[in-house]
């Protein structure tokens, strides 16, 4: 028995070292080769994007739709990019465990975007984005950031320990945090905001006219500006003005 276990250990070590693919239980394990390759893929007909698993998604807005993926050469074929009901889904193949040694990077050009979803440990970045309404959700420990957002309505949902950082302007923002997530938007100008925090989440935002806040747990909400504030606190949470 010990000999068999030792042989199994040697086999796994050799597979890892050589960037091989092995099957352990129901999952197909792919160990990154270390050699990075870039591939262009045609995508069209979407106004939403979802990143699953790990990786970095960089979004730019313009007149065309295009996707470029950089990853290790034996991992790249295992990355799915498909449009389903108007949503571009980016994720590993099902029943596949990717042990990458180099970052997985998606560069996505969009015409318009109404929704961004992040599930897992990934990272979504955009230098600027213009949308009438934007729904942004983070589930897990991932992070999302937009350098300059222009929107009429912004809806943000954070479930878990993820984080969202935004700057720019939105007429109205609706923020929902469940868990220990963080929302950083003190540089995002808004007129009205509705914030719901359940757990130990932390929220910082800028609002000028009206702020409605509900905190259940030990969460904190800090605001910049002089809005009228309506607050409900259940637990040890706090609502305070910055400065």
Give short role names for the model-derived ranges.
Residues 1-243:
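Intrinsically disordered, low-complexity terminal regions
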């Amino acid at each position: 028995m010990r000999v068999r276990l030792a042989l199994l250990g040697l086999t796994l070590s050799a597979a890892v070292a050589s960037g091989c693919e092995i099957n352990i239980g129901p999952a197909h394990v792919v160990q990154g080769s270390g050699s990075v390759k870039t591939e262009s893929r045609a995508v069209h007909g979407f106004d939403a994007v979802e990143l699953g698993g790990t990786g970095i998604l960089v979004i730019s807005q313009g007149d065309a739709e295009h996707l470029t993926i950089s990853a290790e050469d034996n991992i790249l074929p295992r990355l799915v990019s498909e449009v389903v009901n108007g949503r571009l889904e980016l994720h590993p193949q099902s029943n596949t465990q990717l042990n990458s040694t180099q970052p997985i990077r998606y560069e996505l050009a969009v015409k318009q975007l109404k929704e961004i979803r992040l599930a897992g440990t990934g990272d979504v970045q955009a230098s600027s984005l213009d949308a009438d309404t934007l729904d942004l959700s983070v589930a897990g420990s991932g992070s999302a950031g937009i350098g300059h957002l222009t929107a009429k309505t912004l809806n943000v949902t954070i479930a878990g320990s993820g984080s969202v950082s935004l700057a720019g302007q939105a007429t109205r923002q609706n923020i929902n945090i469940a868990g220990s997530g963080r929302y950083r938007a003190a540089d995002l100008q808004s007129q009205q905001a509705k914030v719901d925090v359940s757990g130990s989440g932390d929220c910082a935002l800028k609002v000028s006219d009206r702020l409605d806040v509900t905190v259940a747990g030990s969460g904190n909400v800090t605001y910049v500006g002089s809005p009228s504030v309506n607050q409900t606190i259940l637990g040890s949470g706090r609502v305070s003005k910055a400065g």
